[in-house]
Amino acid sequence: MAEGGGCRERPDAETQKSELGPLMRTTLQRGAQWYLIDSRWFKQWKKYVGFDSWDMYNVGEHNLFPGPIDNSGLFSDPESQTLKEHLIDELDYVLVPTEAWNKLLNWYGCVEGQQPIVRKVVEHGLFVKHCKVEVYLLELKLCENSDPTNVLSCHFSKADTIATIEKEMRKLFNIPAERETRLWNKYMSNTYEQLSKLDNTVQDAGLYQGQVLVIEPQNEDGTWPRQTLQSKSSTAPSRNFTTSPKSSASPYSSVSASLIANGDSTSTCGMHSSGVSRGGSGFSASYNCQEPPSSHIQPGLCGLGNLGNTCFMNSALQCLSNTAPLTDYFLKDEYEAEINRDNPLGMKGEIAEAYAELIKQMWSGRDAHVAPRMFKTQVGRFAPQFSGYQQQDSQELLAFLLDGLHEDLNRVKKKPYLELKDANGRPDAVVAKEAWENHRLRNDSVIVDTFHGLFKSTLVCPECAKVSVTFDPFCYLTLPLPLKKDRVMEVFLVPADPHCRPTQYRVTVPLMGAVSDLCEALSRLSGIAAENMVVADVYNHRFHKIFQMDEGLNHIMPRDDIFVYEVCSTSVDGSECVTLPVYFRERKSRPSSTSSASALYGQPLLLSVPKHKLTLESLYQAVCDRISRYVKQPLPDEFGSSPLEPGACNGSRNSCEGEDEEEMEHQEEGKEQLSETEGSGEDEPGNDPSETTQKKIKGQPCPKRLFTFSLVNSYGTADINSLAADGKLLKLNSRSTLAMDWDSETRRLYYDEQESEAYEKHVSMLQPQKKKKTTVALRDCIELFTTMETLGEHDPWYCPNCKKHQQATKKFDLWSLPKILVVHLKRFSYNRYWRDKLDTVVEFPIRGLNMSEFVCNLSARPYVYDLIAVSNHYGAMGVGHYTAYAKNKLNGKWYYFDDSNVSLASEDQIVTKAAYVLFYQRRDDEFYKTPSLSSSGSSDGGTRPSSSQQGFGDDEACSMDTN
């Protein structure tokens, strides 16, 4: 069917719902095609057909009709139709299978010029296969060996094969079919890896975002242009690291050539990669060097290349790399004797081997930076959520990695079955010892030795006072931050006075407040009564949503464009008014077609009109008055003697985006609503209803109009009917939506685009935003974590005495703490409507974190910790950048790790609002013997000697707000 078109016979709402319902439950199958639809359009369709049982209000009403499928909100560039970055499933788009898409397309059509967004289902995981739709394709940089400066970008699915890429490159670079070619993966400066296994997929090959691929055509004499380089490099010293002596050769070979900047000499470094043979993966596990042998780098100061949104992984890895007990364990090869390849919960030792390989490279002292390609590939095989190239969470990666390393290195070969016992009034020390011993019977690894501690959890039934005490192991502490209570919003106020421009305001409202709170705050600044305000989300020149006063502000996203309109419920004479949404539309004739297309433009209006004066003439005059600031009226003789006809479109069944006879059924039912006594609605297709009206009202002069009106759906994309100019009252209500239809020439002559978009800034916008110095101490977060709370009604506890679920009180306490204490600051919060990041500065001590007072075990050892690493997150939730601060275990100095860049840091840089995950090392740990304990502090990043162990920290934690 034609693009943009919909079928003439659309099923009723119930049929649409029954046909699409089962299709939306389709299981993902590898290789299947699914389509993206803007969630705003899809939600409108669901309302229209009553798809959700809890939202059956006004099902099938014409004003809810969604019109053609419109995905414009998903594009960062409407021309190229490139997807915006960081789109979120269900929030920004929905995924529908092919059959569902075809039905929707047949019923509604698609906005003219838009191409369907179709994506493949790919499979992830090694043991547990997991299918997901690959929303974001991988961008690869392609070039020919003879001209590396001519780089072309192309997108591929992870399911595409190397052969597919080679075929595409041969076509792009016009390489004759009879000429042999080889494909090379260029990475890390001037290192090349041949991709010789053509049936491998992009995912199998470990290709990443922005990877450069080079195609090499064979010379006419049968030799290869790169052959000379390869033969030369074969004599260079090898620096290959393999994961196992038993590893088989990889299908990839690599060769590198580097120019040494300091001096005239040149050096080549030839490397033959080895792959991990187990599992038949065939992955290359080597990390090619780029530094000359003569250059010495401080071990551990090795950057990690960003493989495409992998800064989250790099940040977590740098923190773990600078955790001395764990790193020494791998550098001394102690892991080799403890790999558990038979653990069903493990990963056959492959995660441990990949991590060991990377750590050895990072601490070799030879590399300024490496690309952790194969480590990421291995992680993606076992944890599909990390297999793509979208931004992830460093703490989530850290949690997976610690758990994966634990299971791969678990010394327990056969886990015994253990029955959990209740405390039953026994002393805490007895129950805690029993819980820890049981934990160690099933879990015994370097991760448990280093990172595991013990919680005490106490539940009390509010009815029978039953006390339940349990002790549970933990690997890291997730500490809540005190929630901010307010939210700053920027909105536009559109006054009722047509001569006043809209004004932008900045208001502070309760974080969990209602729309009425926004109106009250705006009223205090503007002087306009809150009851005369209507709050709307404007999107693509239309109202996406008009809010009720009692709706929560958490329905409003930070990215939404919020306009607040001043309206009147009664007119000056006290009569009742109706408030109507009115859109601007421009009619555009299609080439070689008698039909016309329309496009919304400008800011929509909310117009209050007295009900007893609601005729077409008064409506036209009210709109003209309302837009008089940026629309000039034509002079009486400006159009000569003929009436102004802005396109034969108003009410035409050819009127909207290919919607031929789009709303026939709605036109029929809508006619009863437009006027008390309306003439025949049987307008001939293609005729302007204004002409029809003129024929009806003989003897009346034809008015000169800038635009005509159409009754449309809430999207403004489908016409329902024309408005009668018979002088009778129009039967319109607040759920009716109108469109002003302009022709292109009239818009050009009379519509002032610049003035229509002009607005003023209130003083609240001009003044520097006063940000509260939201600073809390780490102590506050720990106290909040250990505070007693009452369980919510949706998260009750089953009381064994009462035999029912109860909203018990719950309290966490710390019983024992590990050698390495990992503290996760819970900065991200989200619900169905709201996603936010807390930028609170948490002051944490660099040295002397005394946790003893928070440990409820009175006989416990002292717990005093010093900071060794911090994972930072800059930016908002779902976007931004991760870095790390870490203290080198050899020289005791602090360094800043930003992907491949490593720089010296000082202590006063570390405590910022970006701090996300903290790593602390216990002072009595045998590994903790660094120069920092004896060296004096200096500006070069050295640390000062600790002064005491009194209080929460030896020294006052510094804070720096990076606003």
UniProtKB/Swiss-Prot annotation:
Residues 485-775 are annotated as: Interacts with DUSP and ubiquitin-like 1 domains and is required for USP4 activation. CDD domains: Peptidase_C19R. Overexpressed in small cell tumors and adenocarcinomas of the lung compared to wild-type lung (at protein level). Expressed in the hippocampal neurons. Changing residue 51 to D: Moderate reduction in thiol-dependent deubiquitinase activity. Changing residue 90 to A: Moderate reduction in thiol-dependent deubiquitinase activity. One of its GO terms (biological process) is positive regulation of TORC1 signaling. It is an enzyme of class 3 (hydrolase). Its EC number is 3.4.19.12. Changing residue 88 to P: Severe reduction in thiol-dependent deubiquitinase activity. Residues 11-122 form the DUSP domain. The keyword Cell division does not apply. Changing residue 91 to E: Moderate reduction in thiol-dependent deubiquitinase activity. Zn(2+) binds at residues 461, 464, 799, 802. Deubiquitinating enzyme that removes conjugated ubiquitin from target proteins. Deubiquitinates PDPK1. Deubiquitinates TRIM21. Deubiquitinates receptor ADORA2A which increases the amount of functional receptor at the cell surface. Deubiquitinates HAS2. Deubiquitinates RHEB in response to EGF signaling, promoting mTORC1 signaling. May regulate mRNA splicing through deubiquitination of the U4 spliceosomal protein PRPF3. This may prevent its recognition by the U5 component PRPF8 thereby destabilizing interactions within the U4/U6.U5 snRNP. This is Ubiquitin carboxyl-terminal hydrolase 4. It comes from Homo sapiens (Human).
